[in-house]
Amino acid sequence: MNIQEAKEEIKRTVEAYHKRDEDGSYKIPVEKQRPLFLMGPPGIGKTAIVEQVAEELGINLISYTITHHTRQSAIGLPFISKKIYGEKEYSVTEYTMSEIVASVYEQIERTGIEEGILFLDEINAVSETLSPTMLQFLQYKTFGMHRVPEGFIIVTAGNPSEFNKSVRDFDIATLDRLRKIDIEEDFQSFKSYAYQAGVHGAITSYLEIKKDRFYFVKQDIEGKRYVTARSWEDLSKLLQVYEELQYPLEKELCQEYLADPEVAEDFTLYYSLYQKYREIYHVPDILEGAEIKETRLFLEAPFDEKLSLLSLLTDALQIAFTDYVKKKELLSRIFRFLKSMKEKLSEVSVSQALEEEIKRQRKRMATLKEARMLSKKEESIRLQLIQMFGDFYSALKERNSTEDTGNREDRKENEADFSLIKDCFRVKEEERQQEVEKTGKMLSNALNFLGNTFGEGQELLLFLSELTKSPYALGFLSDVGNETYSRYNQYLLLKDKQKALQEEAKEVLRS
């Protein structure tokens, strides 16, 4: 299966293993909760999808590369203790708690969350001395004498032997205790992830043109040459910062990420063209609905150049769609806070409630960060949330410093303060609605430009197809809708249906 299908399977498994019966016990007993074994080439995103599942489900994640561990660190250090058997004292060997198991308990203490995923990478490359320990662990979730807490699901990963000389094939006894998921590289599933992760448009459009360069590992007389999904994503992060700093992209830099001279040089050349297209095609003007006179330039452009234009349009819209999703979540959280605060107006002052909430949010964010459970998106939302609560608090202080509140009853003063906060929230919501309207117009302008310039051809079809691969775009369209999008989408669907019927009719006539 591809990486997105594997992610969905992991998510379903975690939810199934965590399902409890009416007595509070897990419906699937711990010893029957088979660990998942993700088998696939390096750099395709096995670790990334496990991180995404943990984030989406709001559970802990502990990750280890098992080949970095010795037998002692895995099962604990031995020590001598005294035991009495049959009224006679004996010296017996016991073990300290495994470093891995201890880290799970520490994570639970940090976050207060008792469920999670324990992810062990390179499990099929463990040393022979660790093999018996791993067999015991896979069946009973124990390292030495200590068990992993019940709420933790075991997910493991490994690479095929052609990618790692240390890999050993599991025997039947081990395989019979695992659920093996074979994962293959797939560019289309990577694209869905790329939109969510904000991968640079130059990379996605380049790979759309040259899909064979998305992932490969080759061996020749000069050594190994390889490019992976991880290579492209990491290069994207650097590329975005380089653009902010106005640094050029050199072939040598690309080759540090793309370990193939030919691909590194080719992408460097494409990126310079991509930047040139950004200047030529005036994407902001298209999205603002300005009249574009040089339509002949677009019509006569080669297909790869048209793909770059579509990518530039998608990139610009993607920023707006992402901002929409974040702002929606941000204001939803503020609304829930205001709703709960309204119910407690008789118990606590508005300013005190805001102070306590700011402290709580900061503490929670620090906890999540320390536990490595804070994604970039979540961190951004929480920082904005703290900033907005701070703005509300400042507005209260400013109002109360200029007004005489000494003669007001506490209850009325609290209601007046709450009314001010509601007004502040209303302003933020109105600003958000204006941005939603602007985003909708940008999308309509992009679609109308493509429709007027290229007609209902493959360019428009490709653009609509790319929108459906972005979870943020789908979120916007699902919540807000867009008349222009619906019109073009329905027309193309009808066109496809008519084409299919025509083909069917031809087949009938032939027979």
Residue ranges of each PLM-predicted region?
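Non-catalytic, well-ordered alpha-helical scaffold segments
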Residues: P132, A229-E233, E265, L307, ...
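Long, charge-rich low-complexity segments
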Residues: L273-A301
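Terminal-proximal interaction/regulatory segments of ATP-powered molecular machines
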Residues: L299-S511
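Conserved AAA+ ATPase small/helical "lid" subdomain
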Residues: K32, S192-D260
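AAA+ P-loop NTPase catalytic core and its hallmark functional loops
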Residues: M1-D212, V217-D220
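Intrinsically disordered or highly flexible coil/loop and linker segments, enriched in small
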Residues: D23, E244-L245, K276, I280
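Conserved helicase/translocase motor-coupling segment
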Residues: L249-Q275, Y281-P284
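Glycine- and charge-enriched loop/helix tracts that form the active or gating conduit
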Residues: K180-E185, V227-R230, K237, K293
